[in-house]
From Swiss-Prot:
GO terms for cellular component: actin filament; autophagosome; clathrin-coated vesicle; CORVET complex; early endosome; glutamatergic synapse; HOPS complex; late endosome membrane. It comes from the Eukaryota. GO terms for molecular function: actin binding; syntaxin binding; ubiquitin protein ligase activity; zinc ion binding. This is Vacuolar protein sorting-associated protein 18 homolog. It is found in: Late endosome membrane; Lysosome membrane; Early endosome; Cytoplasmic vesicle, Autophagosome. The modification N-acetylalanine is found at residue 2. GO terms for biological process: autophagy; endosome organization; endosome to lysosome transport; intracellular protein transport; lysosome organization; negative regulation of intracellular estrogen receptor signaling pathway; protein ubiquitination; regulation of synaptic vesicle exocytosis. It is a peripheral membrane protein. CHCR repeats lie at residues 618-772. Core component of at least two putative endosomal tethering complexes, the homotypic fusion and vacuole protein sorting (HOPS) complex and the class C core vacuole/endosome tethering (CORVET) complex. Their common core is composed of the class C Vps proteins VPS11, VPS16, VPS18 and VPS33A, which in HOPS further associates with VPS39 and VPS41 and in CORVET with VPS8 and TGFBRAP1. Interacts with RAB5C. Interacts with HOOK1. Interacts with STX7, MON1B. Associates with adaptor protein complex 3 (AP-3) and clathrin:AP-3 complexes. Interacts with SYNPO2. Interacts with PLEKHM1.
Amino acid sequence: MASILDEYEDSLSRSAVLQTGCPSVGIPHSGYVSAHLEKEVPIFTKQRVDFTPSERITSLVVSCNQLCMSLGKDTLLRIDLGKASEPNRVELGRKDDAKVHKMFLDHTGSHLLVALSSTEVLYMNRNGQKARPLARWKGQLVESVGWNKAMGNESSTGPILVGTAQGQIFEAELSASEGGLFGPAPDLYFRPLYVLNEEGGPAPVCSLEAERGPDGRGFVIATTRQRLFQFIGRAVEDTEAQGFAGLFAAYTDHPPPFREFPSNLGYSELAFYTPKLRSAPRAFAWMMGDGVLYGSLDCGRPDSLLSEERVWEYPAGVGPGANPPLAIVLTQFHFLLLLADRVEAVCTLTGQVVLRDHFLEKFGPLRHMVKDSSTGHLWAYTERAVFRYHVQREARDVWRTYLDMNRFDLAKEYCRERPDCLDTVLAREADFCFRQHRYLESARCYALTQSYFEEIALKFLEARQEEALAEFLQRKLAGLKPTERTQATLLTTWLTELYLSRLGALQGDPDALTLYRDTRECFRTFLSSPRHKEWLFASRASIHELLASHGDTEHMVYFAVIMQDYERVVAYHCQHEAYEEALAVLARHRDPQLFYKFSPILIRHIPRQLVDAWIEMGSRLDARQLIPALVNYSQGGEAQQVSQAIRYMEFCVNVLGETEQAIHNYLLSLYARGQPASLLAYLEQAGASPHRVHYDLKYALRLCAEHGHHRACVHVYKVLELYEEAVDLALQVDVDLAKQCADLPEEDEELRKKLWLKIARHVVQEEEDVQTAMACLASCPLLKIEDVLPFFPDFVTIDHFKEAICSSLKAYNHHIQELQREMEEATASAQRIRRDLQELRGRYGTVEPQDKCSTCDFPLLNRPFYLFLCGHMFHADCLLQAVRPGLPAYKQARLEELQRKLGAAPPPTKGSVKAKEAEAGAAAVGPSREQLKADLDELVAAECVYCGELMIRSIDRPFIDPQRYEEEHLSWL
């Protein structure tokens, strides 16, 4: 056998297919370019299954990807479409002439019922290999089965409904258990529930569907040839005792509601559309004599499951006459009718035929058509071939259908992922609303389209619909990108103009007060919207001009606050002399730059409140930048003006610790003009060190001199260390102050004496007060009576100076005695020194013949040597070599010079007159040999090389000279 039911094999033959749908979108007016201009794949694509049956196909059912077909009269073929290459062939093994009447497969694909023309029914489970007869069902020609989707599973069907050709509805339950010869039968029970009648009596039950609503109610729809019955009641229970019996018991005394149509095909068929497996069905289609009854299924309705019903007539050439429909299947937006030679698909929204698919005669007439709800595939078959339809993107053009029906919400739902189509729908909806005078809705839709902005705005202007135009502009503004600044500026400016014009028109109308308030609130919402803040900020200059041109000062201030343009707000309050409100804005937003700008204005009107605000700002303000405002304010010289300036400057100096010279200088000037008492206290608090004061000393001196504050000038002189000037000025004020100044130069006694002489001269010559002059002598020990006497006039008697002269003489006498004592002590000390020197000349050391040099370890007496008090002995040349490396460079140079001069000096000759003459001549020319030796000894033998400072300094000296180490290192390489 060839590969069976391969899903994606190329079909061996294709019939002529007519698929009609909505035309391609093309390039719409909005500016969108369709991305679907190329030819699209058809919605319904037919494919013949690569399968050639060995016998004629009599019946075929598909569910949950499981396909079952009957071949001939005695063969069943079961195929798992996921494993199509492994079909399961089952022989029924019947000897009579009974034919397969119908087959029924449940929603799980597990339970198969085979109804025979001999009124017998066979049952076969997916896991079983044998068809088992159902004894309780014998004698009933089964026409339909209503499977229990809520309770059925692979091992049991749960309670199900069975419709027969005699109009009876039975309840039954099947089990998949294999009981063997003596085991239980698969049909657990089979009992009658109801009989369906038409006008002539019982009628065959053509279709049965059982569903369960979300509220727990049960629904059963049963159809005959001309009627559609509904049974609504208590939900199906999971017990054999109740099942569907309770639901049908409610209709024992009265018939259920039904729909009836006059025409008769001799049969009918009901199809449901279920979006997903095990979900509730959404729509139904009933094929009967008058056409197809189509509608929605609404489980929430109390009295009927059916809603939005309408009858679609059969297409031309189809009907109860010569070419009746044989079967119907329902998809999301189409129902497909099976005819003997073709398949026709009809749109459930419009009733138009969108597909007319003819089949080749060689395959024979079509028998039936079924749908697999789990995959959405449609299956049609003839006696010699099987065909499958793929449904692809069925909803692709539904949006246009809904658009033509003016059902815009549904149209937008089905083209949400296609911007070009969505734009078309929105534009059509906007036009529709505009024609219906629903201008606000129209504006909202227009704002979402890509239609030309100018055309839409002009439409609203011509219709005098400013409110709708504002709505359109606002929504357009909200949809702009950050880079579209020009458009944003235009829209914000236009919106502001519209609001202002509307407010101006409503403001004077007392009957429109509520509307005015609402419009004002909308305008403020627009101005304060965070979404529009960026655009409004960019257009703030234009908007302020508009507000000013309309004279709307209220909103001008409101907008300035929103834009945080507090400078404009403060300026507005100042212009209207609302200075306290201006200060409140400054204090609330604490912007230093605004304080600097508006303080010169505010301080003239509310100085105390402004200074309080300055103090509240603390270190956030730079006091230097506020000085100009204070200077202009305090020029009037009034006490209140100066006191407020001083209050802030004192806060800066005492609390903030300001050290800026300009601030301290200005505070000095304020003290000098307004509070002289505080001036000296400030200067004294600042200290007397010229390097630590924060004011300009020269400026302070000039300022104090200009205002006649002499004590302050004296203090500044003292800080400048100009003590003579300080004393001169202090003598004009107070002698005691001058005395304080005179004692300041403690380290310069000459200057102190000079200053006290100034004071004494002043006291004697200006005040003529001898007692005070004598007191000056007592206050300054540097002054003597003889220093002061020249200042007294000649007529003054000596009685005034008696005590002073006596004291002076006593002091001189005491001083002379001290000098004598010191001289005696110096003489005694000199005698002791001479005695010590004599003793030193007599000191000596003993050198034994066996003593050796401390450096070379050779006998010491072989060469000239040095002997130190510590006991170390060195040859002269050995000591020279040991000392030389530790000497500084200048001493090493001096040592070489002495050695050179000693080498050039003539050796001494005893008893020679010529030698004495030579020494005398050499002495006349330069140092003698003895002097050179003495200098050399002083340089080399000043201390022991092992015990002296030289050894201590050599502790951190390396054992090997760095240069020598480098030479040794290179020699080994």
